[in-house]
């Protein structure tokens, strides 16, 4: 029977509707204007959404475990997440459905299983023998709270301590409770009426499995005999207990207490401890007890054959060490090493050579789980150096403020970045290899290079190799190195927009082919970087200062006497070119003492040594104007072929030629409209005209005379007489407004900076991103007033390309497309010098084209298709080393520039069209060029808004991918905008997701799922099918090490380890059944059926088909064997029956 496919039905419906709409459009247009039919290859079956991998440090860690045979590390978190680490490149992420905090983890050593205890009193058994671990069993305690668990090595019985002081025993194979229970009132002294507190420790004697050591929080320790069901010894101490550890010989144990002391006890001497140690306490001269210290939260005792044992502990510092960082103390013989940590210690484990507790442990390393880091300390080398961590756990080293994802990069890019990044690695690491090396890598078919770039709050930019679902840091760039550090708070307040993180990265623009990098920072600064493998010494850092503010000047100000610069109407049929002009850049203050012409950050004026990697090409800063700080940059684009960078904010747009170090364009948003402004807006402030900006700043000029009325304001001098008192009142009012405006501007900037920092905090959407008042609700109302539109119109999208700009154009030309938050798209044409020799000698002419397109909602992304529907990538300059000794002359360098145009338009016929794909918060449009008619239109969402939209390549075609605020991920075919995928994935819960979600080619996407973790996902069916093969394996068959030899005399005199038949002791036959109301067993999806259900897509179907086929084949084989046996038996029976018949056929009845 043929399988019914609902997707093909939907494709037929959508294709039918799209064809109907196309027919309607064709009826509306004459035959000569019909759009050529483009064959689209993408269908619904090419898309499927699934998570792939999660990278980064586990957010809010709470538990730690290690399998010493499999060499696998497990970390649990407060959000119920489970992260497993093997060799570098082998990682796994799991999530408990309840989301409760993980309080403890226990490996079934070398069994491929893990037990997790959660704060909701549930135990889970995880199966690690599959690439995606799943829960086999769960056990929910109903009447008691779980506080501690202990699973002896090579045992299937799990001891579970509770808050009431009782201990229950669970069979880990069936996850059922045993009837054997250790009650707290039987464990303590019968004469004692006080409750000993929750169970904080359980462990069996290394030499006698029948003796169980139980530690209660109040300070009581009990050695329980499992066979006789009574307490052998009871040890009491005045201070509360936090942890207990055995000596491997089973004759002594050590306890850590809340007063910072360690007590060592002999098993057979319960009266008092053999020794009391206060590691960090001051020893008093008169022999009195040392002063109490902070609690020792955990202690471990590990022995060696060749020397003194190691005592390792966390906490216990003296109370007078105020401000001291958390420490891990390693005591070995007479030496004590205090190792300071950067963050609070959550847990630690000592890695030993043997898994057997009754043998010399021979510790070789300590794993320290910190609040925001994972540290591995080498115990075998002097000074206890740390191992170099190969996992990508430093994503959050500084809070992530933005990120970009690039798939299918040039193949030589990752080796180039790795080579320059390898020089940045610090020294002093342990010389040994990383000891956590379990598991095996996956065998994925995905081979194209992938790079992730993250921008951080401290101004750093990190490049990551993300190929084949792994992550490895390649290179780190510190953008703050070009700026002077503010020495005192007063200087910082004079210029900074924000009080903290003035170097935070907001936008990243990167050209992988040319390796040019451009970043925009929170202090309204832009830095352009060029990649070089040579070290250079920059004598003077090139810089430009730009005044990006549109205001009209008063006549009575000194600056007002100069003729103001004029703007060209955008809608003019003959737009005038914009010649470059040069103006001196001087920092000054206005006549009323307001800060003016001063950037927020100060560039270093001393020579700067730039290491191989990304080196500063140009620094651009927006300056203060009339006491008001510059607005933060909202959009950024760079083109290496043109040598241009453009950026915009809520005031306007500026274009810079970074080859000539000149400003080509400086327009306000209103000036982009010219006479075509549909809102008839006037400049927002009638006080100041725009002053000449930094070196190389250009203003638009036109040949007509400017009316004088345009230069005047209501408060300027005019023919009407004004009373001096009225003027004074007006001036006072203006000063108050300016003061309040400055305060408000800085307050808003601080709020934006704090919002960027909140990417590192688990904030909820409701207090910080209100549904009705947030930065993403710019265009959700169709009835926005002109004042509201004016206050909200910001440059939101920029794109360089060679397109058919005007309706009369017959050949494409370089241009810049500009999108704003009110849904308007402008086109600015670029007239480049004819050859590379003239590039530095002649200016780039910039002029508005007059083309204006409108959409509903803020424009997010723009791209272009050729007549065949292929994506037209912007032109670029191939990378070439610039810092070569024989090429010091700038003109010689420029002659060797070979810009490459990857646009297919050069090979097109003149009559062929292009398509402009424009995506806004609400809708997407495909405009036919040069006619500028709407070929296709799709309303993406009515009730929500698009957060991120990207035009991406997939399966030799292109599509539009969108992520909406309501959690839907959608894809549309191009150019017809036919819906292909619409899946509810993730609701917008905080600004972190909104700021970091991005799509990449080949069906890849990512976002910052927590302040420390990146979640990658795919919307490609092919990747989903191959994902199972790409994932690494956690469990590998390894032989368990041999048990330690007991020795002749120990075996003869009974000095060796005593075994215990736990099955006989805890089984149902001897201990009975546990109460059903005590705990509830919940079967998990991770068994044989769970393994079948865990697989997804075609791989899962094939796996199930193979499994069913194997089972059917096995059954058929068994049936065949049974049938053959029955046939053989039948033949034998027939033969014997025939012989009997021949024997007795001639005999009479009386002869028998």
Curated annotation (Swiss-Prot):
Gene3D superfamilies: 1.20.5.110, YVTN repeat-like/Quinoprotein amine dehydrogenase. Transmembrane segments: none annotated. Residues 883-893 have a biased composition (Basic and acidic residues). Residues 14-35, 555-596, 675-731, 883-907 are annotated as: Disordered. Keywords: Cell membrane, Coiled coil, Cytoplasm, Exocytosis, Membrane, Phosphoprotein, Protein transport, Repeat, Transport, WD repeat. It is a peripheral membrane protein. The modification Phosphoserine is found at residues 693, 724, 760, 783, 786, 901, 903, 1059, 1132. InterPro entries: Lethal2_giant (IPR000664), Lgl_C_dom (IPR013905), LLGL2 (IPR013577), V_SNARE_CC (IPR042855), WD40/YVTN_repeat-like_dom_sf (IPR015943), WD40_repeat_dom_sf (IPR036322), WD40_rpt (IPR001680). Part of a complex that contains STX1, STXBP5, SNAP25 and SYT1. Interacts with STX1A and STX4A via its v-SNARE homology domain. Part of a complex that contains STXBP5, STX4A and SNAP23. This is Syntaxin-binding protein 5. It comes from Mus musculus (Mouse).
């Amino acid at each position: 029977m043929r399988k019914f496919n609902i997707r093909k039905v939907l494709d037929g419906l959508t294709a039918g509707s799209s064809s109907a709409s196309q027919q309607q459009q064709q009826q509306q247009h004459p035959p000569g204007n019909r759009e050529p039919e483009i064959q689209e290859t993408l269908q619904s079956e090419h898309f499927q959404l699934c998570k792939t991998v999660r990278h980064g440090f586990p957010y809010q860690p709470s538990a730690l475990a290690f399998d010493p045979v499999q060499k696998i590390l497990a970390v649990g978190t407060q959000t119920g997440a489970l992260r497993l680490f093997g060799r570098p490149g082998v990682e796994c992420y799991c999530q408990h459905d309840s989301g409760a905090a993980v309080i403890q983890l226990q490996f079934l050593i070398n069994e491929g299983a893990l037990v997790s205890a959660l704060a909701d009193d549930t135990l889970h058994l995880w199966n690690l023998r599959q690439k995606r671990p799943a829960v086999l069993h769960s056990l929910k305690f109903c009447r008691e709270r779980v506080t501690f668990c202990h699973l002896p090595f090579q045992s299937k019985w799990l001891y579970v301590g509770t808050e009431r002081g009782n201990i229950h025993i669970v069979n880990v194979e069936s996850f059922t409770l045993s009837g054997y229970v250790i009650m707290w009132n039987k464990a303590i002294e019968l004469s004692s009426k006080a409750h000993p507190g929750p169970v904080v420790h359980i462990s069996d004697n290394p030499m006698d499995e029948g003796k169980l050591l139980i530690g209660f929080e109040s300070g009581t320790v009990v050695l329980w005999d499992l066979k006789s069901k009574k307490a052998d010894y009871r040890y009491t101490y005045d201070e509360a207990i936090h942890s207990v550890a055995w000596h491997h010989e089973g004759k002594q144990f050590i306890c850590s207490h809340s007063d910072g002391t360690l007590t060592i006890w002999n098993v057979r001497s319960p009266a008092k401890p053999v020794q009391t140690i206060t590691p960090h306490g001051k020893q008093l001269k008169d022999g009195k007890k040392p002063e109490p210290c902070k609690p020792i939260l955990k202690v471990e005792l590990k022995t060696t054959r060749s020397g003194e044992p190691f005592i390792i502990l966390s906490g216990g510092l003296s109370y007078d060490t105020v401000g001291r960082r958390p420490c891990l103390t390693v005591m070995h013989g007479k030496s004590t090493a205090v190792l300071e940590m950067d963050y609070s210690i959550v847990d630690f484990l000592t890695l030993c050579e043997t898994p057997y507790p009754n043998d010399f442990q021979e510790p070789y390393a300590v794993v320290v789980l910190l609040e925001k880091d994972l540290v591995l300390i080498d115990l075998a080398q002097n000074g206890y150096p740390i191992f170099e961590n190969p996992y990508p756990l430093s994503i959050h080293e500084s809070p992530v403020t933005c990120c970009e994802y690039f798939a299918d990069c040039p193949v030589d890019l990752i080796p180039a970045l790795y080579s320059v990044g390898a020089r940045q690695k610090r020294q002093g690491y342990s010389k040994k290899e990383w000891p956590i090396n379990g598991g095996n890598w996956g065998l994925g078919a995905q081979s194209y290079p992938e790079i992730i770039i993250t921008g951080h709050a401290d101004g750093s930019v990190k490049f990551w190799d993300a190929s084949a679902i792994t992550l490895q840091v390649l290179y780190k760039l510190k953008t703050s190195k070009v700026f002077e550090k503010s020495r005192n708070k007063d200087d910082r307040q004079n210029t900074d927009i924000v009080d903290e993180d003035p170097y935070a990265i907001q936008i990243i623009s990167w050209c992988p082919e040319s390796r040019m990098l451009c970043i925009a920072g929170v202090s309204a600064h832009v830095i352009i970087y060029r990649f070089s493998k040579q070290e250079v010494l920059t004598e003077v850092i090139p810089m430009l200062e730009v005044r990006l503010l549109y205001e009209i000047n008063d006549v009575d100000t000194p600056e007002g006497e100069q003729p103001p610069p004029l703007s060209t109407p955008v809608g003019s049929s003959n737009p005038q070119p914009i010649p470059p002009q040069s103006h001196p850049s001087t920092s000054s203050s206005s006549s009323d003492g307001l800060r003016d012409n001063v950037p927020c950050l100060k560039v270093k004026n001393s020579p700067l040594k730039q290491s191989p990697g990304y080196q500063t090409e140009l620094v651009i800063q927006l300056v203060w104007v009339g006491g008001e700080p510059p607005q933060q940059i909202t959009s950024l684009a760079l083109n290496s072929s043109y040598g241009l960078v453009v950026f915009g904010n809520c005031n306007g747009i500026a274009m810079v030629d970074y080859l000539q170090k000149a400003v080509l364009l400086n327009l306000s948003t209103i000036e982009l409209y010219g006479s075509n402004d549909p809102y008839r807006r006037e400049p927002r402030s009638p006080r100041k005209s725009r002053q000449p900006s930094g070196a190389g700043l250009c203003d638009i000029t036109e040949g007509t005379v400017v009316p004088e009325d345009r230069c005047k304001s209501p408060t300027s001098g005019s023919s009407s007489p004004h009373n001096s008192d009225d003027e004074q009142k007006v001036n006072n009012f203006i000063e108050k407004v300016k003061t309040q405006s400055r305060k408000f501007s800085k307050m808003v900037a601080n709020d934006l900076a704090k919002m960027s920092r909140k990417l590192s905090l688990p904030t909820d959407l409701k207090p910080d991103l209100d549904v009705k008042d947030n930065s993403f609700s710019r265009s959700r109302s169709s009835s926005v007033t002109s004042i509201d539109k004016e206050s909200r119109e910001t440059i939101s999208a920029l794109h360089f390309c060679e397109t058919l700009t005007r309706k009369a154009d017959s050949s494409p030309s370089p241009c810049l497309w500009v999108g704003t938050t009110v849904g308007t798209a402008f086109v600015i044409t670029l007239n480049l010098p004819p050859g590379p020799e003239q590039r530095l000698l002649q200016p780039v002419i910039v002029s508005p084209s007059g083309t204006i397109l409108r959409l509903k909602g803020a424009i997010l992304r723009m791209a272009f298709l050729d007549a065949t529907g292929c994506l037209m990538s912007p032109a670029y300059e191939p990378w070439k080393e610039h810092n070569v000794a024989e090429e010091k002359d700038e003109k010689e360098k420029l002659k060797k520039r070979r810009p490459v145009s990857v646009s297919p338009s050069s090979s097109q016929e003149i009559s062929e069209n292009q398509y402009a794909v424009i995506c806004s918060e609400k809708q997407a449009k495909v405009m036919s060029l040069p006619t500028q008619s709407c070929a296709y239109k799709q309303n993406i969402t009515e009730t929500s808004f698009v957060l991120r939209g990207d035009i991406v390549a997939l399966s030799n075609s292109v599509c539009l991918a969108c992520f909406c605020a309501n959690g839907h991920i959608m894809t549309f075919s191009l150019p017809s905008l036919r819906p292909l995928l619409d899946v509810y994935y993730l609701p917008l819960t905080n600004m972190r997701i909104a700021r970091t979600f991005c799509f990449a080619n080949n069906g890849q996407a990512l976002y910052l799922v927590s302040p420390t973790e990146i979640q990658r996902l795919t919307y490609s069916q092919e990747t989903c099918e191959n994902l199972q093969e790409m994932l690494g394996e956690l469990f590998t068959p390894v032989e368990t090490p041999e048990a330690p030899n007991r020795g002749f005399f120990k075996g003869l005199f009974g000095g060796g380890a005593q075994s215990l038949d736990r099955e006989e002791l805890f089984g149902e036959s001897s201990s009975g059944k546990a109460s059903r109301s005590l705990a509830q067993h919940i079967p998990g999806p991770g068994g044989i059926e769970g393994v079948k259900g865990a697989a997804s897509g075609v791989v899962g179907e094939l796996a199930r088909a193979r499994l069913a086929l194997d089972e059917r084949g096995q059954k058929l084989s068994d049936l065949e064997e049974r049938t053959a046996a029955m046939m053989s038996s039948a033949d034998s029976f027939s033969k014997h029956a025939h012989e009997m018949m021949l024997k007795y056929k001639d005999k009479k009845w009386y002869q028998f």
